[in-house]
């Protein structure tokens, strides 16, 4: 499981999933919910891509840890969904705040974007988690077992 190939595949799958998901979802939130201009949102997404590349695999490891805890707490499917939301919100919100500060968003825009992102994450539930699981299967991450709570 810890061979260089499987770690590389795991990192690439996690990176692909995070860059695609965060680019699409956060741009929609920034423009339509938080009132950022298209230019501000594009700047934010351009800053976010290298950040997402750096944090994607650590996030995947963090999520897997949260999933193991959730699996021990309850085998129910809702536990996986709740764990996905918790992992995403607690890991991504601080990173998102820093990105928005970097591109010059004001505190009102930051609060709107981050709170909207939290609400959207809760409403979409485990969409990112399912997408991440799909990407891991797509990239044939060796010895990967779909995270089930």
UniProtKB/Swiss-Prot annotation:
The lineage of its organism: Bacteria, Pseudomonadati, Pseudomonadota, Gammaproteobacteria, Enterobacterales. Exports L-alanine. Belongs to the AlaE exporter family. This is L-alanine exporter AlaE. The gene is alaE. GO terms for molecular function: L-amino acid efflux transmembrane transporter activity. It comes from Salmonella arizonae (strain ATCC BAA-731 / CDC346-86 / RSK2980). Its main location: membrane. InterPro entries: Ala_export_AlaE. The keyword Transferase does not apply. Keywords: Amino-acid transport, Cell inner membrane, Cell membrane, Membrane, Transmembrane, Transmembrane helix, Transport. The keyword Transmembrane applies. HAMAP family: L_Ala_exporter (MF_00914). It is a multi-pass membrane protein. It is found in: Cell inner membrane.
């Amino acid at each position: 499981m810890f061979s260089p190939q499987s770690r590389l595949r795991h990192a690439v799958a996690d990176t692909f999933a995070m860059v695609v998901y965060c680019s699409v979802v956060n741009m929609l939130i920034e423009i339509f919910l938080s009132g950022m201009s298209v230019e501000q949102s594009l700047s934010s997404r351009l800053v976010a891509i290298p950040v997402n590349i750096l944090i994607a695999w650590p996030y995947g490891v963090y999520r897997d840890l949260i999933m193991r805890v959730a699996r021990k707490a309850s085998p129910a499917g809702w536990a996986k969904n709740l764990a996905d939301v918790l992992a995403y919100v607690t890991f991504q919100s601080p990173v998102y705040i820093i990105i928005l500060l970097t591109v010059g968003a004001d505190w009102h825009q930051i609060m709107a974007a981050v709170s909207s992102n939290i609400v959207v994450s809760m409403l979409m539930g485990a969409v990112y988690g399912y997408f991440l699981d799909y990407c891991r299967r797509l990239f044939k991450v060796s010895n990967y077992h779909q995270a089930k709570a």
